[in-house]
């Protein structure tokens, strides 16, 4: 029997059943989130991100993630690196491209729960996409083995602007920790607390950002080494609204 492809898999799978099987806490709500991204963002995701941050802001976000991914302990030349909640691959491709110059033999993987985003990811070179939820990365990998070669563990995991879409961030941190190798690291970039409640309708946000101290305390329950910093000078600007960002570095 020929091996199925991601495209074939996405056509055949019944999404609510798969989400339930992966242990999504509220599969119905998550399916609604996925519909939001499919109908409102998938085709124009890259333009949306660019309009929020601008080229300078995007560069600062990418460079901030790279600096921490390149921090000690250094990634090996054959590192396996995963982007969780990669969306269309806007940040994945930029970070992978720069890391490839330093780690030419590294492998890059991208996980997302929106089929339309994954189809966009398939167009990105040298990145292996697969379906999954951040709360159960290990289970998502097991499912993905039917159509892609995905390792069980990674040297590094990163995410950009994904966490505020997750209902249980503690479970996400635990999920990330489970797929990191010994001495592995994770880098998470997301929004600080803000008051723009309209983001929930406009962008399908679950959380109105996070207090960096909250992130630190929650992550420390899972990771022995946690650093959370605000990213000065980087704001998400849209219609005059500005939200600060933070970057969390988590080490096993």
Label every PLM stretch briefly.
Residues 2-74, 90-94, 120, 136:
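Conserved class I S-adenosyl-L-methionine
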Residues 29, 49-50, 91, 187-248:
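C-terminal alpha-helical "lid/dimerization" subdomain adjacent to the S-adenosyl-L-methionine
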Residues 161-162:
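Short catalytic micro-motifs in class I SAM-dependent methyltransferases
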Residues 170-182:
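A short glycine-rich, Lys/Arg-flanked "PGG" loop and its adjoining helix->strand segment in the class I
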Residues 80-144:
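Class I SAM-dependent methyltransferase SAM/SAH-binding core
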Residues 158:
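A conserved beta-strand element that flanks and buttresses the S-adenosyl-L-methionine
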């Amino acid at each position: 029997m020929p091996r199925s492809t991601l495209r074939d898999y996405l056509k055949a799978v019944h999404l609510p059943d798969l989400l339930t099987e992966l242990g999504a806490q509220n599969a119905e709500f998550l399916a609604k989130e996925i519909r939001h991204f499919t109908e409102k963002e998938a085709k124009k995701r890259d333009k949306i991100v660019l309009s929020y941050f601008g080229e300078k802001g995007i560069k600062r976000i990418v460079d901030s993630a790279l600096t921490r991914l390149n921090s000690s302990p250094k990634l090996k030349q054959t590192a396996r690196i995963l982007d969780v909640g990669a969306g269309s691959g806007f940040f994945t491709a930029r970070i992978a491209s720069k890391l490839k110059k330093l780690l030419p033999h590294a492998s890059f993987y991208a996980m997302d729960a929106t089929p339309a985003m994954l189809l966009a990811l398939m167009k990105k070179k040298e990145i292996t996409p697969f379906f999954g939820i951040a709360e159960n990365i290990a289970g998502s990998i097991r499912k993905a083995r039917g159509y892609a070669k995905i390792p069980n563990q990674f040297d590094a995991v990163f995410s950009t602007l994904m966490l505020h879409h997750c209902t249980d961030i503690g479970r996400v941190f635990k999920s990330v920790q489970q797929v990191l190798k010994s001495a592995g690291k994770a880098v998470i970039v997301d929004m600080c607390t803000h008051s723009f409640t309209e983001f929930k309708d406009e962008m399908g946000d679950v959380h109105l950002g996070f207090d960096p101290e909250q992130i630190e305390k929650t992550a420390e329950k899972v990771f022995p080494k946690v650093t959370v910093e605000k990213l000065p000078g980087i704001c998400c600007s849209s219609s005059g609204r500005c939200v600060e960002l933070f970057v969390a570095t988590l080490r096993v």
